[in-house]
Amino acid sequence: MSATAFTLEKIEPIERETIKRVAWRLIPLLMLGYFCAYLDRSNVGMAATTMVVDLHFSNAVFGFGAGLFFLGYFLFEIPSNLILNKIGARRWIARILITWGIIASLTGFVWSEWSFYWNRIFLGLAEAGFYPGVVLYMTWWFPSYYRTRFMSIFQSASVVSLFVGPPIGGLLLYMDGVAGLHGWQWLYIMEGLPPIIMCFVTYVLLTDRPKDAAWLTEEQRTWLQARLDSELEQRESIRKFSLGQAFLTPKMWLLTGAYFGQTSGGYGLTFFMPLIVKGLGVPTGWIGLVTALPFLCAFVAMIYWGWHSDRVGERMWHLVSSYALMAGGMAVCIVIGTGHPVITMVALCLAVAGNQCISPLFWSIPSAMLTGTAAAGGIAMINAIGNLGGWLGPSLYGVMKDATGSTDISLLCLAVLPVLGAISLMVAGHDPRQERMMRRG
């Protein structure tokens, strides 16, 4: 996270100093938690390169099992976010971190298809609520004008994890035979330790609400709360949703479909990227490093695109272009094939950049619509159902790969999904009054 990322426009000193202090206090802490979460996403693909051989898993078994994480995630997502809204982020996020850390480490001891399946379900149950909880938490601290840029910075932790995770995972695979364990077992055991540590850090350092922030001056607390209250009043004057209305309004379901299109294509690509890179003829020792390159490109793209969207006060076409880049990058991979590995890697960089740019922009739309309990439940609903795409994408890719033996056909199935997501997003639309509210700051 660079200093330039936190540079604020020419504004009143109280606003500039308050936002800067809140950002530097909260965002690094949340980023570390999200970094830990994404170690699983980055390393489950690395583990697959040897785990599937040692446990005699097919691509379909691995893809199905990897995606079962999102079944557990789906089942507990809404209750988890409602609990967070009730008891506070500090205690609940700390609980999430320690339980998923323990279960992530236990993945190193699965021995069969069914033990792998159940482990992934319980891991999803444990982690449920972290990401939508942070989306909700951002609305408690950041005015809408700043929210997308800081969501982009927060979410860049996932890209950093996907960038550094594969090389670290590749090194851990070389521990094969140490203490009688396979390399993939060491990979899973070690990835569970950081979230356990972060549990205690979060419990001590995270602050629930601005009124609890002893690290802000009285003047800063007063200004921030007044600004947030003013935005809440403006938003509710457009329309105030109850929890039930948030679950039933057609726009929320269209947004859920849009998010599903991104997650299904994105997770399918992420989980199987090490195997795609291996198919380009990359030596085993270099797979982790080469797999990390698209995420380095995505890191730069998502921070710039989130900042640009906030700066110009526009969401919809920033989002649609990101969906198009994601689908287009995969389409180029299909057309080029494995015969031109450099061009294929460039296309993968574009696809991953498009995928990673979507989420921080996307969440600005429901968080601008909803308030209070409706925000807690509605954001969790979109994330819970949308993230079932994390089950569909890897499963679809694995099944198609086993059935046809073709990477191109498998990628084609994934590329269609963000196209459908973009269509759903455009049908849902975005209230221009919320855009004007952002531009007024």
Predicted region positions:
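Cytoplasmic helix-loop-helix junction between adjacent transmembrane helices
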Residues: N119-S156
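Helix-breaking motifs and short loop linkers at transmembrane-helix boundaries and internal kinks
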Residues: H56, G88, F109-S115, A126, ...
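Helix-to-loop junctions at the C-terminal end of transmembrane segments
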Residues: F76-G88, M302-E314, K401
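C-terminal transmembrane helical hairpin of 12-TM major facilitator-type secondary transporters
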Residues: R315-I365
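Extracytoplasmic gate region of multi-pass secondary transporters
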Residues: V44-G45, G244-I303, S359, W363, ...
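Conserved MFS/SLC helix-loop-helix module at the cytosolic interface between two early adjacent transmembrane helices
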Residues: L75-W114
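Paired small-residue
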Residues: T99, I103, W114-F122, I343-L350
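Glycine-rich segments within core transmembrane alpha-helices of 12-TM secondary carriers
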Residues: R149-L173, P194-P195, N383-G393
